[in-house]
Amino acid sequence: MLFERIQTRTVRLFTHRYLGFKPTALPALPGPHPQQTYVLYAHVPFCKTLCPYCSFNRYPFVQEQAVPYFKNLRQEMRMLKDMGYGFKSLYIGGGTPTIMIDELCATIDLARDLFGLEEVSTETNPNHLEPQIISKLSGRVQRLSVGVQSFDDRLLKQMERHDTYGSGMESLERIIAAKDSFDSLNVDMIFNFPSQTEDMLINDLACILESQANQVTFYPLMASPSVARSLARSLGQVDYSREERYYQMICEVLTGGKHPPYAFGSAWTFKAISDESAMIDEYIVDYEEYPAIGSGGLSYLDGGLYVNTFSVEEYNDLIEAGRMSVIGKTPFTTSDRMRYRFMMQLFGLQLDKRQWERDFGCSVAAGLPVEYSFFKLVGAFAFEDDEKILLTPRGRYLLVALMREFFVGVNKVRDEARQRV
């Protein structure tokens, strides 16, 4: 689609600029503002095996590295407490946070003691949906996100996940068995793998419906330059020309018809209509600002992006020296902050125009005339009044494509930083 290609190139230009982190000698992140609500993100980068399509900050699991890492993650958490930060919500991502379950539980328990958390979300893989692990997470974790990616065994073998994390049927059975142990269980899926056919996608959707998961997130394949070669070798070349068609198939199955099983939670997250309390997967939608701890974490604070060291060894050294792990910073201009707000709120399906005017002192159209006109031109806005903007199906896909490119840009920053490690 022409408009999507134009937008993609534009987003790449902007992300290249405002993800261009400059080294910083700051000993810590900025402190909190009294009226601001924050979510805490903690990153655990260790995985049993490294998937060929993934370029998130991750390293092969080595216990001698992981034990001090978890200890230092808890120490960095104490640093935030000493700075005056408070949190009601903690999101632990990876990597595979459950790779050392006792260390993870100790980290969650400390966070609850320090901050009085109301909710904890963490990620895991299907092979960790075992009774001994679930029993430790249940009650500690309100929302569990399971990285399935696909239920198709052919794709799982190409992804090098089948032997490590289990077959599609094994994953489905484990999800069904674990679902009631948590307030919300989210299934993470990926669509538009090079070798994925429409029939494979339809089967994945059928498995989701059978699982009756509280929530499902369908991410488009995000191929950063560092994994392009391994991805092409194992799965083939990515074809973006069919991405929108696959996305609309997902939306139709999950949200279409007279009695749809799911409703939109964000542009790529779907929550079960039968579960009013389902927690949305995207912490960046619910909270505009967030500090991140752990190797490779990205914080958005005080109108700027901060990046933590991508080296596990350097991370441990910095924390043990009494510093936080931040090593880079990109200050945002007012226009950058507007673009970030525009992207994140529309990704969350509704832009709050009143809040925009309070924060920026102008209308959306005046603040971002090019972006606003572009979205109007391509028919991305379904509804607009003095208070809000809502999206059409085309608009939702444009946000999926936009966020895909944003995260590809983030992953490129990770790639470049890891090359220097």
Question: Which residue ranges define each predicted feature?
Answer:
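Canonical Radical SAM [4Fe-4S] cluster-binding loop centered on the CxxxCxxC motif
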Residues: 34-69, 157-158, 162
